[in-house]
């Protein structure tokens, strides 16, 4: 009986790092889900703005405002086609506008050498405005 006094502490010390890594993984997966939802929502809002106006700067500012839980400075906004490309220049009504948002999310334990993961949100809308 005397040799088993510290057994529980030793078992706890051995399992604690594994438990912490599992908890960190669960939190990271939840963070990925939040980032994906935020990007999808922001892309939809930005595409809606782009379908009603012909202003890429307004589309970018709408995306930056809608991507609230994320750092807007790390979100890359890609608009296809751009403001000065066909069909948005000549006959835009009815053509498609695609807004793609990319966010490089840092991985916990990055010091191990793991790369950042890129999360993407995409939305497509028909252009409604006429020149």
Report residues per predicted region.
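Short, conserved structural patches
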Residues: 52-131
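Alpha-helical assembly-interface signal, strongest on the long, hydrophobic N-terminal helix that forms
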Residues: 1-64
